[in-house]
From Swiss-Prot:
It comes from Physarum polycephalum. This is Ras-like protein 1. It is an enzyme of class 3 (hydrolase). InterPro entries: P-loop_NTPase, Small_GTP-bd, Small_GTPase, Small_GTPase_Ras-type. Its EC number is 3.6.5.2. It is a lipid-anchor. GO terms for biological process: signal transduction.
Amino acid sequence: MTEYKLVIVGGGGVGKSALTIQLIQNHFIDEYDPTIEDSYRKQVTIDEETCLLDILDTAGQEEYSAMRDQYMRTGQGFLCVYSITSRSSFDEIASFREQILRVKDKDKVPMIVVGNKCDLEGERQVTTGEGQDLARSFGCPFMETSAKSRVNVEESFYQLVREIRKDSRTDTKGPGGKGGKKTLKCLLL
């Protein structure tokens, strides 16, 4: 069974834990208890393939930023979450992405931009179009979610797995588009 290491990043209070717990336990937590780091596992079937999601729910607070490099190194795909009710959390997403790309030393990493709390339309500070534009500039999918109303919760995680699958298929293409990883040869003199 394939295992996917998913990492949820974003500022404090955007609903990363609420999304994760809604996916894992089908229940909404409405009290805010800042996360340092929590790990969850769930077996699911995505596009007729049974797989294991290993989800790392991370700290949004700046005081835990030293831990970020480690989980960014090991993660295969990233849910970059902001709250539609917080302009500053939206503005932070680009720096999370830059840090992920720097740590992984890649130009592109499987990720999805997620605008959470879409049930709070009356408090919206970030338009859907702005979220779509940001995701387009990153070359990744975009979704608005609500952990409270269970809108697009499963879909956002499942779409991230599809992005990882797509990325791993393109990674294994060698010269001429045939499968198999490229091997590099070193010669020490």
